[in-house]
Amino acid sequence: MVLAAAMSQDAEPSGPEQPDRDARSVPGAPAPPAPPGPRGMQPPPPPPPPPPPPPQAGLPQIIQNAAKLLDKTPFSVSNPNPLLPSPASLQLAQLQAQLTLHRLKLAQTAVTNNTAAATVLNQVLSKVAMSQPLFNQLRHPSMISAPHGHTGVPPHATTVPSTRFPSNAITFSAGQTRGPGPSVNLPSQPPNTMVMHPFSGVMPQTPAQPAVILGIGKTGPAPAAAGFYEYGKATSGQAYGSETDSQPSFLPASASTSGSVTYEGHYSHSGQDSQAAFPKDFYGPTSQGSQVAGTFAADTAGGLKGEVGPLLQGPNSQWESPHGFSGQSKPDLTAAPNLWPPHPSQPYELYDPEEPTPDRTPPSLGGRLNHSKQGFSGARRRAKEEQAVLSMRPLQVQELNDFHGVAPLHLPHICSICDKKVFDLKDWELHVKGKLHAQKCLLFSENTGVRCVLGPAEGTLCASPNSTAVYNPAGNEDYASNLGTSYAALPARTFTQSNPAFPSASPGMNFVQRKLGAGRVVHICNLPEGSCTENDVINLGLPFGKVTNYILMKSTNQAFLEMAYTEAAQAMVQYYQEKSAMINGEKLLIRMSKRYKELQLKKPGKTVAAIIQDIHSQRERDMFREADRYGPERPRSRSPVSRSLSPRSHTPSFTSCSSSHSPPGPSRADWGNGRDSWEHSPYARREEERGPAPWRENGEDKRDRTDMWAHDRKHYPRQVDKTELDERLEGGRGYREKHPRSGSPSSLHSVSGYKSREDGYYRKEPKGKSDKYLKQQQEAPGRSRRKDEARLRDGRHPYPDDSGKEDGLEAKGTKSKQSEKNRTKRPDRDQEGADDRKESRMAESEAGKEEQDSMEESPSSVGRQEKETESSDAENTRTRKEQDSESGSEAEGESWYPTNMEELVTVDEVGEEEDFIMEPDIPELEEIVPIDQKDKICPEICPCVTTTLELDLAQDFTKEGVKTIGNGATEISLKSPKEPPSASTSCPSDMDVEMPGLNLDAERKPAECETGLSLEGSGCYEQQAKGAESSDVCLAPMLEQMSSPKPAEERAWQPGPFLDDGKVGGTPEDGAAEGRPLEEKASTPTETDLQSQACQGVSTQENSGYVEMKSLDARSPEYTEVELKQPLSLPSWEPEDVFSELSIPLGVEFVVPRTGFYCKLCGLFYTSEEMAKMSHCRSAVHYRNLQKYLSQLAEEGLKETEGAGSPRPEDSGIVPHFERKKL
């Protein structure tokens, strides 16, 4: 860019002025007065001549190296000629360029294959580059070479160029004596940047050195060259070296017209700033050939990005001398017929700038875009060479190198153009020569306005023969190749189109036109091969407005979309720049088309209208399908969750709603929709149709799907109706599949059955959900409340979730929901719950084991267990889901929430989008995921306990009169106490199963400590701790949930006692303890959740559930004691051995934040929560104290169990007692 700028400066003034500029630019170049002849130019820059001799000296090799670059000599020559106003100069430059081209061709292999020669050339070029920025522009090696040649002799120039711009060198050398002047100017201007600019990223080097380095890089030796020559590198000084020169070739053309180019560049500079002015001024005043050269120079030197384009553009806007320019160019072309194509290339560049240069700018978007947009003419670029370089900077050296296929210095290398990782040079070569890279380069140059890239392409185009070779050599230059073919051929064609579009015959006209008027054509690249349809492409644009036309080029994996308005096209491009568009999982490169302002081409295949109609009809079909699937969900998508899902699916594309939904449908959209739509019937029905068998019969499949869904569900149900969602997802899925909805007369599969159940859910959810949410809201801000709620749900569900978690969502939801539902909502459900509980226990035993196995895969185990429990807990699921509605989707919260507690909260607030994150939402509360896991653990631990304890709790709750949603579960627990033997018997099995679960829990607890915290802490612990430590429990669960580590530990530890309790016969007590927490939770249907959310629920729970907790705790201690006593039998195994062995933080809830973090059990203060909960709660001292505490609670619980209803007051006493003991 700097070179371009220097060139522009040189060119801007007239021949005479240019010398001044040259002098100015290059200290060593005292007023190279744009001599009439190329050589005249050569002499003008005194500094350049010295460098040329060195190049000559070292140029034997360099010349050979530059031989390749000579391929572009025509450009160089032509460009120099344009720089030189006189036709004679142009002819001379052409001749020189041809000679140099031949020489360079001879020497090309030498430099390309000879590192030493490349180095020498680099050195020479660096020296020359300093004096002749043009050469830098020309592409460090070539440019510098060219300047040398120009400065010195055309052969020398050629020789120097041979590094990179053989032709360019020749062009400069022969093209124009003036060339050196501009070259000098450029160097003095430190056009390194400019050089880079022309070459996109190479310019960063010092004015001269960078060019040289770049040149070498192109050759392969120069590091800078690598950046600039990335593409050149690909050509490796082959034809592409020339190709690199292709840009440099342009620059060579520029070099050739160095003086002119510089002049023009300068003009371009100012002119381009005022685009018309420069082109007019320069083009008009300067010989057109010169102007052309200038343009090329601007293009090449100006970064070949927008400079030439801008120059042309400027001229284009006032293409006054487009023909003249063309003519002038033609002399250049005379040297190389392709030179004219370069002119089209220039127009192409113009097009480039016009086409959102930013498109090209991705790598060098800034510079390109800025420049294209700034001046869209090399002039401006040059005028702001530095700036251009900077803007070009966006076009990193690496991007340039990648663009040009320069072999990476380090492997593995990620192609900055294609974002593809290449592990070895062979792969790199293949990649560079591949379609993807070519297309990306094309897109890159197009979108980035990479004149550099385009320049090379243009240069290639210009020196079609050389350029083509260059392009091919550049293999990497697939882009160039494409450009060459599409742009070389197309430039003429495209430009031709442009020409028609523009009055001027110059192909650049098109660009000018494009530039002049913002286009409404969007260029889409990197379409997935063979899997992209017109619909996919059009779908990308539909969200932004009407698509009026399109072109889908499957062979090149490109497409053009014509929007009705430029604003729509710009909005589309801007949007997809921020969020990559995806088709079939492949990222698309979407940029404003620089080639087309509108698509007047015949539409291939179907008409846009037909396709859009197809898309709309397809969307309707998809919507209907979704309606079937998630039909009600769709409307429900008005809910944040649905919105989340919808936007999420819409995110990729407007029409991808359905498609997005469809693909995720089974895993995300389906469950999301299912939970989204209150009408599960369509969703359930669809789900059943889709995978009833797999989900029902195949635990794994179900788990797989359920895993995703579980996460989503967890969040979503939370927002929607966890019960409903649970029902939908679990029940809908597994329960529905396994059991017709118990609640619904028809089978789950039947829509009516589904709806019946859903209706129940709707009815219930309002209750449970309302209660849950009301309580949650009362207790805490919605978000933390929901999180805590989820936690508490998990905690509450831990009992039910012992089996329920094993069941995934089913057992837990079934139990807690059943219990709560039975209690608060349906007495008959209590029976159902009991049956379900029995089923749950059995299923939980199985699921407990399964869950233990898959506990870590909480979603998986959820799915699997869900399946199991769904079969055995069909009613449980239904009841649980109903209860979930009542309890605010406890089960869902539990099983889903744990996975993504944060998500759930976010989902509640934000919508279903969070559902996606459901699993990832561990950050908000580590407890969240742990909750899920521990919930599973808890379910394993508490299946019996939950059932028996729930029965006990139900009794206790009945005594206590705490009958809420949790009451269903509590009542079940109450029943348990009545059947302590059976409960114990049942529990022992369950407990055995669950004890392993606990072990697994313990094992998982380290990872799931927080989970255990929320689950066990909220559930088991809360039950136990609530029994023993109602206030502590409330606070602890809050704190625990807030700080998951310790509560997790304690909860994890307590689950063991629960299990033990359940086993021993304290199951009723445990159940009572659980039931009480459930009661409390039940009191506030969400209280269970709230307790899980102890943090949130603490206020309310502490208030309403707190008292209850204390009474519960009164009982809970007994239960806990029973549990502890049993744990005392088993405790050594579970709490002590298991936890010690597993080093799981237990009793985390006992760590409460005070001055520091204080462990109430051990009376120890810690400054860090992590230290207290993670380290201390894993310590033997804490384990022992916790065991003692639990044993005490168990003893007290036994006593209290007898008077389970009254102990609540005692609970407070017990907790304080415990606290005292702790203290």
Curated annotation (Swiss-Prot):
Entry GO MF terms: mRNA binding; pre-mRNA intronic binding; splicing factor binding; zinc ion binding
For the modification Phosphoserine, the affected residues are 637, 639, 642, 644, 662, 681, 744, 803, 861, 872, 887, 889, 973, 976, 1044, 1111, 1116, 1206
Query: What is the annotated localization of this protein?
Result: Nucleus; Cytoplasm, Cytoplasmic ribonucleoprotein granule
Renumbered zinc finger spans (U1-type): 410-444
Kindly provide the PTM information from the record: Phosphorylation regulates the subcellular localization. Phosphorylation of Ser-637 and Ser-639 in the RS (arginine/serine-rich) region promotes nuclear localization of the protein. In contrast, phosphorylation of the C-terminal disordered region promotes localization to cytoplasmic ribonucleoprotein granules.
Q: Which CDD domains match?
A: RRM_RBM20
- Which UniProt keyword terms apply here? Cytoplasm, Metal-binding, mRNA processing, mRNA splicing, Nucleus, Phosphoprotein, RNA-binding, Zinc, Zinc-finger
Magnesium as UniProt keyword: no
Identify the stretch(es) annotated as RS: 630-657
* Residue intervals of the RRM domain: 520-595
Q: Where does it sit, as one GO cellular component term?
A: cytoplasmic ribonucleoprotein granule
Q: Which SUPFAM superfamilies match?
A: RNA-binding domain, RBD (SSF54928)
Q: Where along the chain is composition biased (Pro residues)?
A: 29-57
Segments carrying the region annotation (Disordered) are 1-59, 238-288, 306-381, 626-902, 971-995, 1042-1102, 1197-1223
Composition bias of kind Low complexity appears in 638-662, 742-752
Chain intervals annotated as zinc finger (Matrin-type) = 1157-1188
Where is this protein chiefly located?
nucleus
Cross-referenced PROSITE patterns? RRM, ZF_MATRIN
| GO BP terms, alphabetized | heart formation; mRNA processing; regulation of mRNA splicing, via spliceosome; regulation of RNA splicing; RNA splicing
Protein's UniProt name: RNA-binding protein 20
The protein's organism comes out as Sus scrofa
